[in-house]
Amino acid sequence: MPKIKTVRGAAKRFKKTASGGFKRKQSHLRHILTKKTTKRKRHLCHKSMVAKADQVLVVACLPYA
């Protein structure tokens, strides 16, 4: 039986936590930042967790995580 390939793009975007969840970076913080408030940018800079509904897809992309 061959090894299952890891989706490399997903491996760079998600990190598994000790409790079994996945951390992810929030979007909308790369460009066009002048119109966004400081508060909005500050809240976007923190890591977020992958939703439970999407966790199945992430696990399929990262078989050895």
From Swiss-Prot:
**Keywords recorded for this protein, A-Z:** Ribonucleoprotein, Ribosomal protein
Where does the record place Basic residues bias? 10-26
Question: What Gene3D superfamilies has UniProt attached to this entry?
Answer: 4.10.410.60
Q: What is this protein called?
A: Large ribosomal subunit protein bL35
Tell me the organism: Haemophilus ducreyi (strain 35000HP / ATCC 700724)
The organism's lineage? Bacteria, Pseudomonadati, Pseudomonadota, Gammaproteobacteria, Pasteurellales
Q: Where is this region: Disordered?
A: 1-26
Question: Which GO biological-process labels does this protein carry?
Answer: translation
Asked if the Swiss-Prot or TrEMBL record annotates the protein with the keyword Ribosomal protein, the reply is yes
Supply one GO molecular-function term.
structural constituent of ribosome
Regarding protein family, the annotation reads: Belongs to the bacterial ribosomal protein bL35 family.
- Underlying gene: rpmI
GO cellular component terms attached to this protein's record: cytosolic large ribosomal subunit
**Which InterPro entries does this one have?**
Ribosomal_bL35, Ribosomal_bL35-like, Ribosomal_bL35_CS, Ribosomal_bL35_sf
Q: Taxonomically, which superkingdom?
A: Bacteria
